[in-house]
Regions:
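Class I SAM-dependent methyltransferase SAM/SAH-binding core
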Residues: 59-115
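A short acidic, Gly/Pro-enriched loop at the edge of an enzyme's catalytic core
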Residues: 114-125
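A short SAM/SAH-binding and catalytic strip from SAM-dependent methyltransferases
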Residues: 125-138
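Conserved beta-strand signature within the Rossmann-like core of class I S-adenosyl-L-methionine
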Residues: 153-159
Length: 225
């Protein structure tokens, strides 16, 4: 087969990718395992820009397989919450962090970013790894995040994709997943519309951790309530 390696070629690959929007069933289970592994370097890089205090209360939106919840449990002595709208993601995150849940240090909740099941002014930090692509309305959903943040609280966004003109694979992913990819300037604009300030971004270009031929732009954005 002589097709470009950067194109999405097989139906199996397409089915797996489509499942990334909301993991379900056996494919979703497999995908979450792959995400836990493939996003690790990105997450480490992103978190290196985040100052976490021992008493910070943290919410991870779109917690997926739960590895970032597990990470934060080692960085704060306070409770860590994970939220996802995928049933299987909630199940996997719960299994991974069961000991902390039993100790009362962790909660994994099924829910949507558009209607967070938390009181106003609850969290010091809300994190979003590889998930804002799928938020129904980024500005309004960011306002909902701001609602549950304490005064001076932080929203942290970590993405491995930025808009890349002429990238055929990215275009296919956008079409397949109905996803939205934002630049640092767009994040700045939309987060300000949502009421955030002190917005800073960090970018890093490098090979994708799974495909050495695919170069992506890593982007971390931090803003304050």
């Amino acid at each position: 087969m002589s097709e470009n390696k950067e194109n999405i070629r097989t139906q199996e690959e397409k089915d797996l990718i489509i499942n990334a929007r909301k993991p379900e069933g056996e494919l979703g289970d497999q995908l979450l395992d792959r995400m836990n592994e493939s996003h690790e370097k990105l997450a480490q890089w992103g978190v290196s820009h985040l100052d976490i205090e021992k008493d910070d209360l943290i919410l991870d939106i779109g917690c997926g397989g739960g590895v970032n919840v597990e990470r934060f449990l080692k960085m704060t002595e306070n409770k860590v919450y994970g939220l996802d709208y995928s049933d299987i993601a909630v199940e996997k995150s719960t299994r991974l962090n069961q000991d902390a849940i039993d100790e009362g240090r962790c909660e994994i909740i099924h829910g949507s970013v558009s209607e967070l099941p938390f009181e106003d002014n609850s969290f010091d930090i809300v994190t979003c790894f590889e998930t804002v692509y799928f938020w129904p309305d980024f500005v309004n959903d960011s306002k909902e995040v701001r609602r549950v943040l304490k005064d001076d609280g932080i929203i942290f966004i970590c993405n491995e994709a930025i808009p890349t003109e002429g990238d055929q694979r990215q275009k296919e992913l956008i079409d397949l997943l109905e996803m939205k990819i934002y630049s640092d300037d767009q994040f700045d604009q939309f987060l300000r519309e949502a009421g955030f300030s002190d917005i800073i971004s960090f970018s890093k270009d490098g090979p994708d951790s799974l495909d050495k031929e695919l170069v992506t732009g890593w982007l971390t954005v931090i803003a304050r309530k």
